[in-house]
Amino acid sequence: MAGKKKSLVAPRTLKGFQDFLPGDALLRAAVIRRIQAIFELYGYSPVETPALEHMDVLLGAGGEETNKELFRLESPEEDPIALRFDLTVPFARLMAQYPEQIKAPFRRYAMGPVWRADKPGPGRFRQFTQVDIDAAGAATVS
């Protein structure tokens, strides 16, 4: 063992992903707080859903194009699951899953990371923050 050097792992970020160092992270947090305050001023409530969803829930009737964008995984129970590619599909699942707790009209917002397994490019990332706002069952958005 003496004389053998451990090889170091080269630190690197996956293609299509990015780190936010303190300056950028603080700016992003300030922008998010401002957006949240505006949404809440207009009567929208925050909702959070898991980053992972069942594959059939995410695909629904989304077709082949959506299918290509998924980061696929398998749960410990061997169920097909994937990282969410947007925040709207999980919201639709939430509305269908909790009809007694969530009554229309329901105004909600969500912010968080989403993942798409498409080709990254300038300004196009595989993980990015999405801001989503919906007025379910409301005649108007205000």
Kindly give the residue locations of the regions a language model identified:
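TRNA-recognition modules of translation machinery and tRNA-sensing kinases, especially anticodon-binding
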Residues: A2-S142
